[in-house]
Amino acid sequence: MSQDIAKKIIGSEEWCSFPELGIPAIKARVDSGAKTSSIHAVNIQTFQRDGEEWVSFEVHPLRIDRRTVVRCQRPVIDKRIIKNSSGNSETRFVIRTPLKLNKKVWDIELTLSNRDAMGFRMLLGREAMMDRLIIDPALQCALGEVSKESLGKAYTKEETRKGGLKIGILACNESLYGNQRLLEAGRERGHEMLFLDIKQCYLKLDTLEPEVHYKGRLLNDLDAVLTKIGSNITPYATALSRQFESMGIYTCNSSSAISQSGDKLFSLQLLLKSGINIPITGFANSPIDASDLIEMVGGAPLIIKLLEGGQGQGPILAKTKNAAESLINTFKFLRANLLVQQFIKEANGKILRCLVINGKVVASIERTAASGELSSNTHQDGKSSIVKITPEERSLALKAAKVLGLQIASVDIINSKAGPLLLEVNSSPELEGIEIATGKDIAGMVISSIEKKLQWKRPLPQQS
């Protein structure tokens, strides 16, 4: 009984610190259901020091703040297979370091893991609390809060490391999740990241000195450009990408690849020519052809897609022939180009999305449309979950990206009775749904792919 009284009562979340890691404050989720403790770590690299294996890593201790970085080094005491929140097993490095909580200090073991998709940068498990702490789930920060002012004094924003690349993100809306993640991921790795609003870029056509300007500044010193666009502005964005190429600047997806994938009709024709199966699809330029067009794809129900659709816009399920004719005539009256496509009933509204980077499928999710909706893009309230793909699906995704010449692409696949069918290939993958569903640092993988193409290597920590 006296031993229980000596234990400290803590809440479901608490502020703590790691003096030897240089982390003065980090909020932890307290979970007795988890055996091990874990801390958010990125850019994890091992190295040798005095004949022992060490690990260097970076911690973003504050939630929703990637500019605050603490760089750490500790000896590796173990490597363990841990099951993550998605139910997948992964191998993690284990370190031992002193934890400070309410003026008490003791050593705990921490696994290093990317916790970007989690609500907390740290998880305090039961092994670290054994014989010391008691949890009251009704409490939060029972040992005291840390103010924003205190955090501001404790941490300083780090400047970009010298020797990194200069990378431009060519897009329209800087505040979008994917653009923010790419900017943050690049800065984490020591690169100078620039957001380039497509509408504020202009170019100079010249045989000897081609140029691109942005807000009056000449962009001739970029190492790489990553173009993230919607299909409605593909022509101008493609022209800008082509101009960067003529200046000798590396573009992650070439202008020709962006152009091909941005034209849905042309891309489907190219994919079919390469032997890739798609749902039966029709296209016409006149509403007079609506009835025959509907029969061409097997009749209603069928799918109607706007050629210029993006971020989940466009796909509509027409359940009857009359509804299909009405929709086709309406869109044609509005001079909107569209495709009609066979409806795959057995798919039950589920679409497989594979993310391809440099010839590898690095992540895959299954997207399910919200009730009453057809599009399952996460921008439209659809649900995403991690899924293991088959060799046939993997081969299809890789071939589709290769046919269109894309180094970075999302490939949408639908499963039919005849096997997997390709729906669409996008040169500007939406990152939010796939990062949240998989817990993977997809933005970091994209930046890493640029580093590999340009043969840039991250400086290793100095060995003593």
From Swiss-Prot:
Region (Alpha-L-glutamate ligase): 165-464
Binding positions for ATP per the UniProt entry: K305, Q342, F343, S376, N377
Keyword Plastid: no
All residue ranges annotated as the ATP-grasp domain in the record: 268-451
GO cellular component, one term: cytoplasm
Residues spanning the membrane: none
Single GO term (MF): ribosomal S6-glutamic acid ligase activity
Cofactor: record remark: Binds 2 magnesium or manganese ions per subunit.
UniProt GO BP: protein modification process; SOS response; translation
UniProt: Mn(2+) 1 binding residues: D412, E424
Cofactor(s) needed for function: Mg(2+); Mn(2+)
Binding locations of Mg(2+) 2: E424, N426
Name of the top EC class for this enzyme: ligase
Chain positions covered by the region annotation Unknown: 1-164
One of the Pfam families matching this protein, by short name: RimK
EC number(s) given by UniProt: 6.3.2.-
Residues that bind Mg(2+) 1: D412, E424
Keywords, ordered alphabetically: ATP-binding, Ligase, Magnesium, Manganese, Metal-binding, Nucleotide-binding, Protein biosynthesis
Entry binding sites for Mn(2+) 2: E424, N426
Domain of life: Bacteria
Family: In the C-terminal section; belongs to the RimK family.
Annotated protein name in UniProt: Probable alpha-L-glutamate ligase
Organism from which the protein derives: Desulfotalea psychrophila (strain LSv54 / DSM 12343)
Annotated gene: rimK
